[in-house]
């Protein structure tokens, strides 16, 4: 039976334990996700407490990380999503995303509405990908793809 969580702390505690096991085993998120049939970003989100894994994937991930049965069950439960503290992020990487939305949020909104009409981009029917590419000017660049289904506003 599908179960739901009402408290974010249990998944945050599990995420801490998962990250410790990941570090001890020297595994990447890609290695943990391998064989689950799910995207690296989705599995990572589940490991960090923001998604629920199907039972088979939870068992595969649990075996790689030596998680107990309770932890494997928790990975399958629908989490309390979006539970980052209600404040401006202080972590530099997360702050840059916040800053990007501060600078480009109105631009994204205007372009989405111009191209699609009144509506939203789903974070439920959604795909996320992060790639590292060479910068022709030297160094590296991050290419982040946010792929969400457009859901039009429906008058009623």
Swiss-Prot record:
Pfam families: Cyanate_lyase (PF02560), CYNS_N (PF21291). It catalyses: cyanate + hydrogencarbonate + 3 H(+) = NH4(+) + 2 CO2. GO terms for molecular function: cyanate hydratase activity; DNA binding. The active site is at residues 96, 99, 122. It comes from the Bacteria. GO terms for biological process: cyanate metabolic process. InterPro entries: Cyanase, Cyanate_lyase_C, Cyanate_lyase_C_sf, CYNS_N, Lambda_DNA-bd_dom_sf. Its EC number is 4.2.1.104. Keywords: Lyase. Homodecamer composed of five homodimers. Catalyzes the reaction of cyanate with bicarbonate to produce ammonia and carbon dioxide. Belongs to the cyanase family. This is Cyanate hydratase. It comes from Escherichia coli O157:H7.
């Amino acid at each position: 039976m599908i179960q739901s969580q009402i408290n974010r702390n249990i998944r945050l505690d599990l995420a801490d334990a998962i990250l410790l096991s990941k570090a001890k085993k020297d595994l990447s998120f890609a290695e943990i996700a391998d064989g689950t049939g799910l995207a690296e970003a989705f599995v990572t989100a589940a490991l960090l407490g923001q998604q629920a894994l199907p039972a088979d994937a939870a068992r595969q991930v649990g075996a790689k990380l030596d998680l107990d049965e309770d932890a494997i069950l928790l990975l399958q439960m629908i989490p309390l999503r979006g539970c980052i503290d209600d404040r401006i992020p202080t972590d530099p990487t997360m702050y840059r995303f916040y800053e990007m939305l501060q600078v480009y949020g109105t631009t994204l909104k205007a372009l989405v509405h111009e191209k699609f009409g009144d509506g939203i981009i789903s974070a439920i029917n959604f795909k996320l990908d992060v790639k590292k590419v060479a910068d022709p000017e030297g160094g590296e660049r991050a290419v982040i793809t946010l792929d969400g289904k457009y859901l039009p506003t429906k008058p009623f």
